[in-house]
């Protein structure tokens, strides 16, 4: 018995520590999955030994106490958390408990929503006006974050309509879309500031700033999902109708909500959301399942820390703990040196992960990482796995320091780091085999010259056998030479030659993008092509002329000039011009186009649901718009889809007009 008491006490101590790190300091040290595992272990032990349950056990409360830096707020209606299920068997057990308690065998209707991975907040409206916003805190006492929440443009300061209750407390999640998170971290790296491990931490850190002006600059947004206090008014008697009422009041509600009757429909919804998860544009960690009928919710009631009528059906963990075995350094297309951690294989989000990016030397220093450390690895959607933290309490005595190389690990050339840049680069250029390989892979990629069948392994063999040194050499290949490659028969070789022949006919924009000029992406390449129309015009441009193009500032202009003036690049382009051609761009006379988009610089952001992004770009361009990839003072209009992030925030900061996709479709039809 003593060993069980000791085990329970150890779990409670550890859980309290991690609750404080997560809920109060916003500095979690372990993945959610590890916390959930420990909590479940403690619950199981307490269930087996109920006499050992204490009032202060982590199983008997929601979270941790708030900091003293903010005014404390007592929740009139406690903000409880949800119990979790992690597989279909556990979900079916929840479904059975609900049916048993209601004493019914009839299929029940559940409202299924996304489980957002952000920070839970309470919004109190009095006579329709936002008077207070608070964090969940420990569920009973939170922190007053009204000044910060008022800076989030998704949250209305006054509710719409006439049927607003005298007092209503709306609950929801503040979160940061992935695009905004990535830009926030990129800016922080450039300035040597704090880099956040994930969007949830970024949202929490942004909301808990003592200076609301800092919060106002962060790309936060909000979805509501429930109500706490209600006084002087009525709500519908089903949860989904409540969500529709919130929407009518002007509160943002996720579109991915569905009524499901019976467990089969619930599980099908869960599987569909798991499949769609990577394309949402923001982080979720599961699906929330609620009995839709509010009368039935009242009958089911609550346990100590959670409602009986709801559960969170969580996805496989996106973060796991493993150990760093070694660190290697890879060389990219532009010479960027990227440290990569070789890991003890671990399953993350359903995939075995054995490698993870460490980004650069600054990131290694920020993490305080050493070889042999136990680390937290994160994999979200299609994002390359990355190390987001070190578990210092598990550091062994024999860890080794990571030494960043001074010479390229592939070609031996010096590595340099330009002042103000986080990335170190090999100076070998196309002398470096690694850079040659990556430049060629980019040149033949789908959005560049789109050489069908020319995969990475073929490029690697072509370089290793010294058949190809630069993009122009690709068009000198013969079927006979290609049959000398591994797994390349005569038919495959002929198909590849045919694909190369087809790739000779392209567009000026694709050609510029294929060259791989630093920081010239698809949008910038398209803008350069539209502005200069010919390669000769582009070659003749000076810095100031280049800077007049949308998306092109001082840095990009210098990259373009340096690339086009480099002797080796000039020779390669001359050879390519002999074989690659594109039609003369049609001159679009903006004055002759009767369209609200004519002559306007337009930026698309967020997820579009009616048109694909490429379709939207094509239709806007056809009506005389210049579609840019970034927001600046030159931007005339921003079209914001779902989960728009930092670009929307910047547009609002600069006072640029913003419309949604529906308005864009309407204007396209004019």
From Swiss-Prot:
Reaction(s) this enzyme catalyzes, per UniProt: NAD(+) + (deoxyribonucleotide)n-3'-hydroxyl + 5'-phospho-(deoxyribonucleotide)m = (deoxyribonucleotide)n+m + AMP + beta-nicotinamide D-nucleotide
Gene transcribed to yield this protein: ligA
Domain spans labelled BRCT: 592-670
Enzyme Commission code: 6.5.1.2
Keyword set, alphabetical order: DNA damage, DNA repair, DNA replication, Ligase, Magnesium, Manganese, Metal-binding, NAD, Zinc
Nuclease as UniProt keyword: no
Example of a GO biological process term: DNA replication
Function: DNA ligase that catalyzes the formation of phosphodiester linkages between 5'-phosphoryl and 3'-hydroxyl groups in double-stranded DNA using NAD as a coenzyme and as the energy source for the reaction. It is essential for DNA replication and repair of damaged DNA.
Record GO cellular component, one term: cytosol
Cofactor: Mg(2+); Mn(2+)
Family annotation (Gene3D superfamilies): 5' to 3' exonuclease, C-terminal subdomain (1.10.150.20), 6.20.10.30, BRCT domain (3.40.50.10190), DNA ligase/mRNA capping enzyme (3.30.470.30), Helix hairpin bin (1.10.287.610), Nucleic acid-binding proteins (2.40.50.140)
GO MF assignments: DNA binding; DNA ligase (NAD+) activity; metal ion binding
Name under which the protein is recorded: DNA ligase
Pfam families: BRCT (PF00533), DNA_ligase_aden (PF01653), DNA_ligase_OB (PF03120), DNA_ligase_ZBD (PF03119), HHH_2 (PF12826), HHH_5 (PF14520), Nlig-Ia (PF22745)
Binding site for Zn(2+): 408, 411, 426, 432
Homology family: Belongs to the NAD-dependent DNA ligase family. LigA subfamily.
HAMAP family tied to this protein: DNA_ligase_A (MF_01588)
Top class in the EC scheme: ligase
PROSITE patterns: BRCT, DNA_LIGASE_N1, DNA_LIGASE_N2
